[in-house]
Swiss-Prot record:
Superkingdom as given in the UniProt entry: Bacteria
Reactions this protein catalyses: uridine(34) in tRNA + AH2 + O2 = 5-hydroxyuridine(34) in tRNA + A + H2O
Function: Catalyzes oxygen-dependent 5-hydroxyuridine (ho5U) modification at position 34 in tRNAs.
HAMAP family: TrhO
EC main group: oxidoreductase
Active-site positions on this chain: C177
Protein's UniProt keywords contain Secreted: no
Similarity annotation: Belongs to the TrhO family.
UniProt-listed Enzyme Commission number(s): 1.14.-.-
Protein's name according to its UniProt entry: tRNA uridine(34) hydroxylase
Organism, scientific name: Staphylococcus aureus (strain JH9)
Single GO MF annotation: oxidoreductase activity, acting on paired donors, with incorporation or reduction of molecular oxygen
Domain Rhodanese: 123-217
UniProt record, GO biological process: tRNA modification
Length: 318
């Protein structure tokens, strides 16, 4: 495999994010890189793909900058690009928590746990493990015994914690996310909220899965990633599938977006059921006049109406 996917972040001061974004985009395009990078006055958060040579040049370029000299890159090998375009965007935050009183992880953040230390926390009955990701990420894969917050956006996590505070009272709290960036700010917020014993998986799930000692142990399913790959393996010890097909509940790890562009809900669904239910999550979405699955597959009106009757069987067995 001649390509690599990089995942990285750094909380550091960037004085002029707009100018930085413009210059950085030009550099990335000159090196044929593709991906998504967010920059703000608080730092950088990025994931991109390119050939091994070009991604190595990118990492060297970043490490030559005093602000990013010690930035850690999580690296995955890939068959080709994991993104279709290159975006570098200035933002208010590099990860959107939207707090009234913002947290600076450089001053306030939870204790860092190495993969081995985190594995011990997973085995400790007096420790509560909070998944700091969204519900659809959790449903594809998560650490055994972790708590699943009922959220679809990171910014909703603080409110969910406040509503469920009883679950965590007088417990050691450990949190994790994909690459670590969400936990940097979230664990800092937990400390400001009065939680005393707060820790985080340093480097996130991505680092834990590559650790030679832990080998992804106690991870079930796959890890959701925000690129064309959709998911990657983490557990090198045992393979489990925890995702369930939206329609029949069978084991499934295949995510699609609902074919109704006004819905776009992410659902786990087999190829067979995607065909059967017109790529949609519901009857209403399947019959939507702008159904992308119908358009992409040139399905005739007669066939469309015929497949819509498949939803009748669903309701009969519900």
């Amino acid at each position: 495999m001649n390509y690599q996917v990089l995942l990285y972040y750094k909380y550091t001061t960037i004085d002029d994010p707009e100018q930085f974004a413009q210059d950085h985009l030009a550099f990335c395009k000159a090196h044929h890189l593709k991906g998504r990078i967010l920059v703000s006055t608080e730092g950088i958060n990025g994931t991109l793909s390119g050939t091994k040579e070009e991604t190595e040049q990118y990492m060297a370029h970043m490490h030559a900058d005093e602000r990013f000299k010690d930035m850690v890159f999580k690296i995955d090998e890939a068959e080709g690009h994991a993104f279709k375009k290159m975006h570098v965007r200035p933002r208010k935050e590099i990860v959107a928590l939207d707090l009234e009183d913002d947290v600076d992880p450089r001053h306030t953040t939870g204790q860092y746990l190495s993969p081995v230390e985190f594995r011990k926390a997973l085995e400790d009955d007096d420790t509560v493990i909070i998944d700091a990701r969204n519900d659809y990420e959790f449903d594809l894969g998560h650490f055994r015994g972790a708590i699943r917050p009922d959220i679809t956006r990171f910014r909703d996590l603080p409110d969910w914690i406040k509503e469920n505070k009883a679950l965590f009272t007088d417990k050691k709290v450990v949190t994790y996310c994909t690459g670590g960036i969400r936990c940097e700010k979230f664990s800092g917020w937990l400390l400001k909220e009065g939680f005393e014993d707060v820790a985080q998986l340093h480097g996130g799930i991505a680092t834990y899965g590559k650790d030679p000692e832990t080998k992804g142990q106690y991870w079930d399913g796959k890890m959701y990633v925000f690129d064309d790959r959709i998911s990657v393996d983490i557990n090198q010890v045992e393979k489990t599938i925890i995702g369930k097909d939206w329609f029949d509940g069978k084991p499934c790890e295949r995510y699609i977006n609902c074919a109704n562009p006004e819905c776009n809900k992410q659902i786990l669904v087999s190829e067979e059921n995607e065909t059967k239910y017109l790529g949609a999550c519901s009857y209403e979405c399947a019959k939507h006049e702008r159904n992308r699955y119908v358009q992409a597959n040139n399905i005739s009106d007669n066939e469309w109406q015929q497949r819509l009757t498949n939803f009748d069987d669903l309701h009969q067995h519900a």
